[in-house]
Each structure stands twice: as structure tokens, then as C-alpha cells.
Amino acid sequence: MNFTRIDLNTWNRREHFALYRQQIKCGFSLTTKLDITALRTALAETGYKFYPLMIYLISRAVNQFPEFRMALKDNELIYWDQSDPVFTVFHKETETFSALSCRYFPDLSEFMAGYNAVTAEYQHDTRLFPQGNLPENHLNISSLPWVSFDGFNLNITGNDDYFAPVFTMAKFQQEGDRVLLPVSVQVHHAVCDGFHAARFINTLQLMCDNILK
């Protein structure tokens, strides 16, 4: 996968990167509630399932912002030209999950075809990583459809330079005539600030509002 190198000598976040990578090693998690009322209406018109559609929308938003596509490669900070989703699928019979990956395509129908092909091939494979090694240029998506939450955090230890974002969805919430989806966004502070997380969330909300436009 192609990528762009970041020149740390001229990068406007070089001080922030050094601080949160070397001195105050930290990430942060931000949980919000997306209004998916319009999106659920669109689902009825398209015939698509909710989970893969959200995987598509999150991947689409990620691929608009370099902050969510960063990694260390050969000890250099880079951002991928494109990031592809790694998503979890649940196995009821074993009460375990697998992590699968499919390629991101800007075209929704093309993405859905790829997603459906991957899930059909591995739907009965209960290994954690049925496809083997995950792509380097990945983002992480999972869902907890059994429970709603107002906050969610993963405590990642032992890999201070893991910059791929983690997105976790929860059970819908009904508030009046609106349907809300709790979504947690977890990032490494070395490459992403609150501003970037907020911009991502606002972009994702616009995509949910205008999926058919």
C-alpha cells in the first residue's frame, strides 16, 4: 500500500508528536451519539444491512483525514494513501469473535460487494484471524449491539506506537422521534488531537444524514 512520509523537521505537530509519544505516552477515547434517524430510513430504501453500512461510512470518513491513517513504518512517521477496515464478526455458537478485513472502495456498491464476499467466505471460521495477517493500512471497527453505553475505552498496553484508530459502536437508543447510535472513537494523542476527533465525528454525522444524496 502506498503512503506519504511526514517530515518531522517541518511538521506543524512535531512538538505534540514528541510529547505524547515519548514523554506523556497517551491516547484518548471520545464517545458521542450519532443521529442515525435518516440513515435507518435510507437502509429501507437500499436494502443494505446496518453494520456494513456503518463500516463503509466510518472508513469513508477515515480516508478523508491523514490523522486517522498514520503509522510508523521503518521508524518513519507516515500516513497511508488509503486505510482499509478491520471489523469484528460475532459467532453465536462459540460466543467468540473473528477479525476480518476488506478493501475500502469509495463506491458504496463496490464496497458492499467486497464486504459480502469476505463475510460469506469466512462466516463459519471461528479463528481470531481467519485471513492471516491483517493489512498494515488498517483501521479498527467493532460493535456491541447488546448494550448501550455513554463511554467506552480500550486500555492498550505494550505497543506505544500503535496509531490505528479504534471505533466501537453500541446498541441504538431511542430519544423521542430520533434514533441515536453511541460510538466511541479511540486514538493515539501523538497523531490526533481533540480537534481532529471532533472534525471526524462531525463529518461522519453529515455522512449519516446524507447517505443517499
From Swiss-Prot:
- Record InterPro entries: CAT-like_dom_sf, Chloramphenicol_AcTrfase_AS, Cmp_AcTrfase
Which EC class is this protein assigned? transferase
Q: Gene3D superfamilies given for it?
A: Chloramphenicol acetyltransferase-like domain (3.30.559.10)
Q: Where is the signal peptide?
A: none
The superkingdom of the source organism is: Bacteria
Residues the record marks as active site? H189
Q: Name one GO molecular function term.
A: chloramphenicol O-acetyltransferase activity
What's the short name of a Pfam family annotated to this entry? CAT
Q: Which UniProt keywords apply?
A: Acyltransferase, Antibiotic resistance, Plasmid, Transferase
Recorded E.C. number(s)?
A: 2.3.1.28
Keyword rRNA-binding attached: no
Coiled-coil residue spans: none
- Kindly state which reaction or reactions the protein catalyses: chloramphenicol + acetyl-CoA = chloramphenicol 3-acetate + CoA
List this protein's GO terms for biological process. Answer: response to antibiotic
Additional comment: Type II chloramphenicol acetyltransferases are sensitive to inhibition by thiol-reactive reagents. The inactivation occurs as a result of chemical modification of Cys-26.
How is this protein organized at the quaternary level? Homotrimer.
Q: What does this protein do?
A: This enzyme is an effector of chloramphenicol resistance in bacteria.
Q: Which family does it belong to?
A: Belongs to the chloramphenicol acetyltransferase family.
Q: What is this protein called?
A: Chloramphenicol acetyltransferase 2
Q: Which organism is it from?
A: Escherichia coli
Instruction: Show the taxonomic lineage.
Output: Bacteria, Pseudomonadati, Pseudomonadota, Gammaproteobacteria, Enterobacterales
Q: Which gene encodes it?
A: cmlA
